[in-house]
Regions:
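N-terminal basic, amphipathic alpha-helical segments
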Residues: 1-147, 327, 351, 355-362, ...
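Short glycine/serine/threonine/alanine-rich loop segments
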Residues: 55, 72, 230, 292, ...
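Short beta-strand "wing" residues that participate in macromolecule-binding interfaces
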Residues: 74-75, 182, 443
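Conserved core of the PLP fold type I
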Residues: 150-290, 295, 301-317, 389, ...
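Conserved core segment of the aminotransferase class I/II
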Residues: 318-387
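Conserved PLP-dependent catalytic core of the aminotransferase class-I/II
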Residues: 382-408
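AMP-binding (ANL) adenylation modules
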Residues: 449-453
């Protein structure tokens, strides 16, 4: 086979502050994951890699070991390094088109049990769907915090009722990338993304009203709907294209059947779906025709693997009736709880609810995020994070294909943080969850994402944690736990 040669002048990925050996490995990793290098291709020798990148033999060797640990290359005695064979991709889960009648959310304790273990130290992968700590810009945020504290000590005690004007300006400036034009005064800052969703629901619906939402859906949305005394109507969703517009059309033909629709169109949690542009247009048009508002969460929209950021539903909103919600909690600063919403024509009601029910938030943290956005740090961070998540998603998908038993299906997200896995029908994901918890393997059972029983043989994993030999070992063990149920 012809030996693979790399362009010496090609940019090394990932960029510093990663160790040099990871930067050297990054070029090979990119060539492998994009398909330029295929299973069985011979790779440059250690000596050649040293010459190509001007590094020491120990650095080149560490680069190959790092790639070996990720399952991307293999060493053959007396022959050198080769691209490792890739496992056959698993098929995608299929759309379950069944619809349940609208009903009050009745928690069965499983979600509460999941939340109790969500902060369990040492779990790998972790239970929480967010970027791993080593991928977060903690050092930069600490530096900005110290700098802003010196310049503006008053921020530690001063509170702006509508939130930081600087942050609202930065959010408005960046909104154009998602296809929507916003004025800073149209933006309301919140204590995280879920508070934004909570305020939005209270602004457009009341106890007893029916809320249409994707099925499966993020379990905290079900918890919020339950806390407000509302009913949920689960609309079937496809793991690739998201909410079924046809099913929503059918469900809303009776006037007043649905008071609002809640949707995560870009890289939905738990399935990772990305709604096509035409479906986004159809959804907004259908909501306008039937007279119900749409509450949109775009918390994962910046985590795209492709070149283009997908537009938000609100970019198609001529009636100003889409309430756009987002936050910086998944990819920048989980502990800051900085979120925001653009409520459109519901702004006054959302402001009233916010002012009556919660604090404006910590202005210092809002100012830190604002400066992070303004000085280019956010863009640099997101480029690195997206590259890392794309690699981690592929590594996890390969491991699942390698270690899980036959009969499994796997979503193929084009961004976000979540993988949705369909197990053989006879597997009970609750039992998988219970055993995995005992062994510190962070897995979410499908039943937490629905009020029905249709996802009892599904699980959600996330790929926010950097790929390590320990993570691969835990996934291999998870595959064994699943296989044990098959006998």
């Amino acid at each position: 086979m012809e030996e693979a040669l790399l362009d010496v002048d090609a940019p090394l990925l990932p960029a510093p502050p990663f160790p040099l050996y990871q930067a050297v490995a990054g070029g090979l990793e990119k060539a492998i994951t994009c398909g330029s290098l295929r299973g069985g291709d011979r790779l440059p020798s250690v000596r050649q890699l040293c010459q190509q990148h001007g590094v020491s033999a120990s650095t080149a060797t560490l680069a190959y070991r790092w790639l070996e640990n990720r399952g991307l290359v293999e060493a053959r005695p007396k022959s050198g390094y080769f691209v490792a064979p890739r496992p056959q991709p698993l098929p995608e889960p299929e759309l379950d088109a069944r619809m349940s009648k609208a009903d009050f959310v009745t928690p069965d304790g499983l979600t509460r049990q999941f939340l109790l273990v969500a902060n369990e130290p040492g779990a790998m992968p972790s239970f929480r769907v967010q970027a791993g700590r080593s991928l977060l810009p903690e050092a930069k945020l600490r530096q900005l915090t110290a700098s802003i504290n010196r310049r503006h000590p008053e921020y530690a005690s001063r509170v702006e009722s509508s939130g930081s004007p600087a942050l609202r300006r930065e959010i408005a400036r960046r909104a154009i990338h998602s296809g929507v034009r916003l004025h800073p005064d149209e933006i309301l800052l919140t204590n995280g993304g879920m508070e934004a969703m909570h305020i939005a629901l209270r602004a457009v619906a009341k106890a007893g009203d029916t809320i249409a939402l994707e099925s499966p859906t993020y379990f905290m949305l079900l918890e919020v709907i339950e806390s407000l005394g509302m009913r949920s109507l689960e609309i079937p969703s496809h793991p690739r294209d998201g909410l079924s517009i046809e099913a929503l059309d059918l469900a809303t033909r009776t006037p007043g059947a649905v008071r609002a629709c809640v949707v995560i169109p870009n890289f939905q949690n738990p399935v990772g779906s990305l709604m096509p542009l035409e479906n986004k247009r159809r959804l907004v048009a259908l909501a306008a025709e039937r007279g119900f508002p749409v509450i949109e969460s775009d918390i994962y929209g910046e985590l795209h693997f492709g070149d283009e950021r997908p537009p938000v539903l609100k970019s198609f909103d001529a009636r100003d009736d889409v309430i756009l919600c987002s936050a910086f909690t998944k990819a920048v600063a989980p502990g800051y709880r900085v979120g925001w919403m653009a409520p459109g024509r519901h702004l006054r009601e959302c402001q009233s609810i916010k002012f009556r029910t919660s604090s404006p938030g910590v202005q210092l943290q809002q100012e830190v995020i604002a400066e992070f956005l303004a000085d280019g740090g956010y863009d640099h961070h997101m480029r690195r994070l997206r590259a890392a998540l794309k690699t981690q998603a592929q590594a996890m998908a390969d491991a699942i294909a390698r270690y899980f038993p036959p009969g499994c299906r796997l979503s193929r997200p084009r961004g976000g943080l979540a993988l949705w896995i369909e197990l053989p029908p006879q597997v009970d994901s609750r039992k998988v969850f219970e055993q995995a918890c005992r062994e510190l393997i962070g897995v979410a059972p499908g039943a937490t994402f629905t009020c029905s029983a249709r996802f009892n043989h599904f699980i959600r994993l996330h790929y926010g944690d950097p790929w390590t030999p320990l993570l691969e070992t835990r996934l291999k063990r998870l595959g064994q736990i699943i296989a044990e149920q098959l006998g």
